[in-house]
Amino acid sequence: MAAERQSLVNKDAQSAAIPTAPWAVAQPSPRDPSRWLPQAIAHRGAKLDWPENTMAAFRGAVKAGAHAIETDIHLSADGVAVISHDPSLKRCFGVDNRISECSWEYLSALRTVAEPHEPMPRLKDFLEWLTHPELEKIWVVLDVKLNNDPTDLMAAIGRALDSVHGPVPWDQRIVVGCWNASFLQAARSQLPSYPLAHIGISLLYSHHFLRVPNLGFSLNQMTLVGPAGKLFLRELQRTDKLLMTWTVNEPRRMEWCIRQNLGHPRHPRTNSEGPAIIDGVITDNPRLYREICEKFEDEMDGKFVRPKLSFTQTVKNKAETLTFVLLTQSWMVLYHVLRRWQGKFDFLKDRQTLDKR
């Protein structure tokens, strides 16, 4: 692993770093600027109330108070960037076909199984909606899926971005999320002005991206709990990396994310007190997350006193956390081995530097 990490550092990496995403960092609390609250990022829109990854879900996310929207990109058979999490149409649209085998004309006629039976949007449709003046501050995380050729998919994303012009340049509103080295390299080639983030579920794999200048991270929250996660968080803070975490739906997990930003001496991005470790919380329930933020601040301000846990409950919570950490670490190793065997986790030592375009 040390040799793989060393391969990321070269002269080219110092000359043309990946752009940063200052709009995506944790925000200072209006109550106390020393508190840095992770932004609320709606996972596939407001998917608890609307069919996921539809325009209705995106509109619902904004109404729920989300600062940003996370959504997923696939490529149709005729080269159109479309929004869907699954490569198959079965779960959401009830059709046993794959997106990559269907034309946009066919896909556009489908409706979700879940009511109110929404159509699949193109990335272009989503961007056109985002041009509305009242949505100017809403930003986006694109989860670029691995099921297509990376160059073809990034080129299709680029065509969609070029076809729609908004009040703020898209490279100042969009973070492009990539799972592996091949897709990161394609993004650097096709979308050189856009901030990038590595999406990860295995710290064993994610670790070798740490030394890529300005590369953000979007990591499964389960992997960040426990000793290995703590070390990874410390390294992200030391190198001032953007960090988003997913999918955080339980109040305890939401509060854990908020508390990671407490007790640090200085914010490196703004030279002010209270650095953020976690910049964004990707959740199915942005409204609940905003409520948890308010409750957390009430506690910090002395307006709310948390009931003291009994000894039995304290022991139970610690046992649950230990079990959670052990299961997560075991699952992470198995997942890492599986994805390497499938050829999905390629390393940067096998690619050109991300900073050579």
What are these model-derived regions, one by one?
Residues 45, 74, 78, 86-87, ...:
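Active-site beta-loop-alpha junctions enriched in small/polar residues
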Residues 43, 61, 72, 107, ...:
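Conserved, mostly hydrophobic/aromatic
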Residues 55, 59, 63, 120-131, ...:
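Amphipathic, non-transmembrane alpha-helical secondary structure
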Residues 57-75, 126, 211-217:
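Catalytic domains of carbohydrate-active enzymes, especially glycoside hydrolases
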Residues 26-49, 229:
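N-terminal small/glycine-rich loop or linker at the start of catalytic domains
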Residues 2-26, 197-357:
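C-terminal active-site rim and adjoining tail of enzyme catalytic domains
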Residues 17-32, 37, 85-200, 219-220, ...:
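Metal-dependent phosphodiesterase/phospholipase catalytic core, i.e.
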